[in-house]
C-alpha cells in the first residue's frame, strides 16, 4: 500500500531534506513545472529509491538535492547545511567533500588504473586517503585483484564497482546514484545493487538512487514516488511487485 510521504523537519537523523522545492524549465506558455513545492526527507543510514512516471521530476529532484542544478524556490539541506544558501565556491566544496556520485555512465579515466580512479577525487581535493577505509571499501566490492587494471581491462560491472568505490572512499555524507544499473546486464546490475545495499547495512552509508526499474528499487529500504513534480507517496520495505503496482497506480504502465 502506498503511504503518504512524511514532511517532518530536518533533524540530526536526516541526511538530506527538501522544503518547498520548485524548479521550472522554460517561460510563458512553454514553461514546465518540473518540481512543484516538493517536501521530502531522506534518513541517514538508509537506502532510498526515487521513482515515478516519465516526466515526473525524479531526475530533476536528485540533481537539485545533489547541488548539480539550482532550484527556483525552496531549500535543500545536507545535514544542517543549506545548499540553496551557498555560493558557487562553497557548493563546489560541499559536492567535493560531502557528496558521492554514481552515474549510469561509469566516468572512469581510461589512462588510470582502477586504484587511481578510485582515489582521483581525494587527490584532486588534496586529501590523503584513509587506507583502512579504502581497504574496507575495496574488499566489500571485490576489487582487490583488479586495482592495477585499467578500465578497458574490466567488465561493465567491474567498472561500475570502481565508480562505487570512488563515490565511497571519501566517506561522504550521502551517495547519489542516477540509474546506476542502466548500462549493465542483469547479473552485473544485481551485483552493484547488492553492494549499494551492503554499503548501507555494513558501512553505514546513506544512498539515494533514481531508477525506473522496480527490481532495482526493491533493494531499497524505502521508495519515494513522484508524479507531475510532486511527492505522490512512498513505499516502505518495497518489493518488485509492490513497486510495480504503485507505478501502475500512477499511470506509468
Feature locations, PLM:
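Short coil-to-helix segment of the ABC ATPase nucleotide-binding domain corresponding to the Q-loop/switch region
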Residues: 112-120
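Conserved ABC ATPase signature
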Residues: 150-160
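ABC ATPase NBD coupling module
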Residues: 27-32, 83-100, 124, 241-245
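Conserved catalytic motifs of ABC-family nucleotide-binding domains
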Residues: 171
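Catalytic Walker B motif of ABC-type/P-loop ATPase nucleotide-binding domains
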Residues: 175-178
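Conserved ABC transporter NBD signature motif
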Residues: 74-82
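Hydrophobic anchor residue at the start of the ABC signature
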Residues: 164, 192
Amino acid at each position: 500500500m502506498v503511504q503518504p510521504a512524511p514532511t517532518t523537519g530536518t533533524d540530526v537523523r536526516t541526511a538530506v531534506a527538501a522544503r518547498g522545492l520548485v524548479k521550472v524549465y522554460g517561460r510563458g506558455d512553454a514553461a514546465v513545472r518540473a518540481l512543484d513545492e516538493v517536501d521530502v526527507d531522506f534518513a541517514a543510514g538508509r537506502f532510498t529509491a526515487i521513482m515515478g512516471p516519465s516526466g515526473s521530476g525524479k531526475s530533476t529532484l536528485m540533481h537539485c538535492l545533489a547541488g548539480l542544478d539550482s532550484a527556483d524556490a525552496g531549500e535543500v539541506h545536507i545535514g544542517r547545511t543549506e545548499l540553496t544558501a551557498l555560493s558557487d565556491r562553497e557548493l563546489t566544496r560541499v559536492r567535493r567533500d560531502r557528496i558521492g556520485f554514481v552515474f549510469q555512465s561509469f566516468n572512469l579515466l581510461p589512462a588510470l588504473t582502477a586504484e587511481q580512479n578510485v582515489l582521483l577525487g581525494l587527490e584532486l581535493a588534496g586529501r590523503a586517503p584513509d587506507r583502512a577505509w579504502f581497504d574496507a571499501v575495496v574488499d566489500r566490492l571485490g576489487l582487490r585483484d583488479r586495482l592495477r587494471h585499467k578500465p578497458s581491462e574490466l567488465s561493465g560491472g567491474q567498472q561500475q564497482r570502481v565508480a562505487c568505490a570512488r563515490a565511497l572512499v571519501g566517506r561522504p555524507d550521502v551517495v547519489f546514484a542516477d540509474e546506476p544499473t542502466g548500462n549493465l546486464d542483469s547479473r552485473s546490475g544485481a551485483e552493484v545493487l547488492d553492494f549499494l545495499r551492503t554499503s548501507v547495512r555494513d558501512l553505514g552509508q546513506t544512498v539515494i538512487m533514481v531508477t525506473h526499474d522496480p527490481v532495482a528499487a526493491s533493494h531499497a529500504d524505502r521508495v519515494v514516488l513522484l508524479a507531475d513534480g510532486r511527492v505522490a507517496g512512498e513505499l516502505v520495505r518495497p518489493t518488485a511487485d509492490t513497486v510495480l503496482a504503485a507505478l501502475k497506480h500512477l499511470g506509468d504502465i
